[in-house]
A protein has these predicted regions:
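Bacterial Sec-dependent N-terminal signal peptides
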Residues: 1-33
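Extended soluble regions of mature proteins
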Residues: 25-286
Length: 286
């Protein structure tokens, strides 16, 4: 009986270790994408609240331990969700480009993050704008022919409230659960901040979602600060973007994550395509 319990314990420990290893190294094999020139951005709303979320933080008090640092901007008429690390990099590269038209730049200007500078992943390079009951996702990809935008109704997660409470990020929170896009999620929300929003596509609870994660802990979003602001909300003109199906984007992102060398044509010293499979766990399974 003791042997059986120990065997199960070891198996569970190994499974959790594999999940954590994936979460800690989320999408670290694909290089940076072209910058987005912030000089071409336009104002579309005014933000009144900014909520900052750490993605897969090892230490919530150390931003250098995050895969990404993301911002939810709540405006008068719309919301925007985007990567601060990518925005910071685009801004620095835009300034550098004004004085250095050659197109070359220092690696120091690439997005920060625990994976190392300049590594693409879809949660960093997607910008979500919610308005009029829908979310429009603008996706930046390693291959520009797959860049575009797609619309979807504002997701209506079917949350189940639980009696569990805890202090999360300094807020008194209540726990809720849901099944969304093929994964089970747990969220901690606070009515101290009366906003029915959260990170990424999450929302619909009686208060701000402070922390949310999937059951396998591949993805964890945790609030680091909430700010009252009055600042313009900006977005790229996206003049060259075309509509693209969400399914097409998800299919491409699976291919490039599972075998980037094959899709991007990476070659070894002998000219052979470097084809190697890597496990990939997207946040959306359906």
């Amino acid at each position: 009986m003791i042997f059986f319990c120990m065997k199960n314990f070891i198996i569970i420990t190994l499974l959790l270790a594999n999940a954590m290893a994936f979460a800690q190294n989320k999408q670290s094999r694909i290089g940076y994408v072209a910058m987005s020139n912030t000089d071409n951005y336009v104002v579309f709303d005014t933000a009144t609240v900014r909520v900052w979320y750490a993605l897969n933080a090892l230490d919530i008090n150390d931003e250098n331990s995050y895969i990404d640092w993301q911002i939810l901007e709540v405006g008068k008429y719309s919301n925007k969700y985007y990567s601060y690390f990518v925005w910071e990099s685009d801004s620095l590269r835009t300034v550098d480009y004004r004085t250095n038209r050659s197109g070359s730049f220092s690696n120091k200007l690439l997005p920060r993050g625990r994976n190392g500078k300049g590594h693409w992943n879809e949660l960093q390079y997607h910008v979500l704008i919610a308005e009029n009951g829908k979310i429009r996702t603008y996706n930046r990809e390693r291959l520009p022919q797959y860049e575009g935008y797609y619309d979807e109704p504002y997701p209506n997660q079917q949350w189940t409230l639980t009696p569990d409470t805890a202090t999360v990020s300094g807020y008194h929170c209540q726990k809720a659960t849901c099944h969304f896009r093929g994964r089970d999620f747990e969220a901690w929300f606070t009515t101290d901040v009366p906003l029915k929003f959260g990170p990424w596509k999450f929302g619909g609870l009686p208060g701000l979602i402070v922390k949310v994660y999937d059951a396998d802990h591949y993805y964890t979003f945790e609030c680091t600060k909430v700010e009252r602001v009055h600042r313009p909300m900006v977005k790229s003109k996206y003049s060259r973007r075309r509509p693209i199906k969400r399914e097409t984007v998800l299919k491409f992102e699976r291919k490039i994550n599972e075998n980037p060398g094959k899709l991007l044509g990476w070659k070894d010293m002998e000219g052979n395509i470097i084809s190697k499979f890597y496990p990939y766990e997207p946040i959306e399974l359906e």
